[in-house]
Amino acid sequence: MLQISNLLLVADVSAQAANNSAVGMIGSFIAAALLIVIPATAFLIFVSQNDSLERTSTGRR
């Protein structure tokens, strides 16, 4: 951790700028989860469940 703080001091990056960047990055991760990961997971589970039901009802396994 000491190396990172030294790097920030050498690069003349303010703590507020670093904090805003970190908050933005976390916000991007949350937005990606909401917009991409959760709908894709729900779709794959839905398709998987329907395929399983179709294979079971037709007698093919």
Swiss-Prot record:
One of its GO terms (biological process) is photosynthesis. One of its GO terms (cellular component) is plasma membrane-derived thylakoid membrane. It is a single-pass membrane protein. It is found in: Cellular thylakoid membrane. Keywords: Membrane, Photosynthesis, Photosystem II, Thylakoid, Transmembrane, Transmembrane helix. Pfam families: PsbX. The keyword Transmembrane helix applies. Its main location: membrane. The chain crosses the membrane at residues 26-46. InterPro entries: PSII_PsbX, PSII_PsbX_type_2_subfam. Coiled coil: none annotated. Involved in the binding and/or turnover of quinones at the Q(B) site of Photosystem II. PSII consists of a core antenna complex that captures photons, and an electron transfer chain that converts photonic excitation into a charge separation. PSII forms dimeric complexes. Belongs to the PsbX family. Type 2 subfamily. This is Photosystem II reaction center X protein. It comes from Prochlorococcus marinus (strain MIT 9215). The lineage of its organism: Bacteria, Bacillati, Cyanobacteriota, Cyanophyceae, Synechococcales. The gene is psbX.
